[in-house]
Amino acid sequence: NKVIVSTKETAGAILSLIVGVHNEYVNRSTALNRISKITFFLLKSQHRHGIFAAYYDARKSIPEYRNELAIYDVQATAAILEALLIARQYFKEDNEAEKDLRARITQVYDRVNWQAIASSDNLLRSKLALLDENDYNNAPLSNLDEAINTYLLASGHPKYALPSSAYFDAVYHQFKKIKQD
């Protein structure tokens, strides 16, 4: 039996755990342990340029593909990165468990190569195929509501940053498309 987990939904779960700790509904060590398990899972999971699949078989740490295509989800990855970076800020106590969590979250974030998934005009691809021949008809990530956080993560990356103009280019691309339609 497979246990399918969603990358994007896991981001919401991480944030809920933090809110639960803050409001004293969830024990801090319980939340820390769960988020630690998630980061261990992500560090050993298959990815492409640091981008995760939308779904995984939790027992095997392998992607669960829809429509038999190996596709990795840029927005789902951005959502879980955001949640993990918030957790990294929240779990800031000076003890080994929290230091270890912060270090692993940094590892997950640092391995995302935003430059490798950007087009020549610095627009991020919304999906990323495992095999290049399956990476056809891939629309750029330019949705005004959902793209902003992804582009902010990409422009703030310590090693593989996109230029800060990339977000503005994505917005312009979206308006240009609307104007042409």
Regions inferred by a protein language model and the residue ranges of each:
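Extended ligand-binding clefts on enzyme/binding-domain cores
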Residues: G50-T77, A83-L85, E93-D181
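Membrane helical hairpin/interfacial module
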Residues: K2-A11, L15-A70
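Short, compositionally biased low-complexity segments
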Residues: K8-T10, A78-L81
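Short glycine/serine- and small hydrophobic-enriched flexible loop segments
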Residues: I14-H22, E82-Q89, Y151-A154
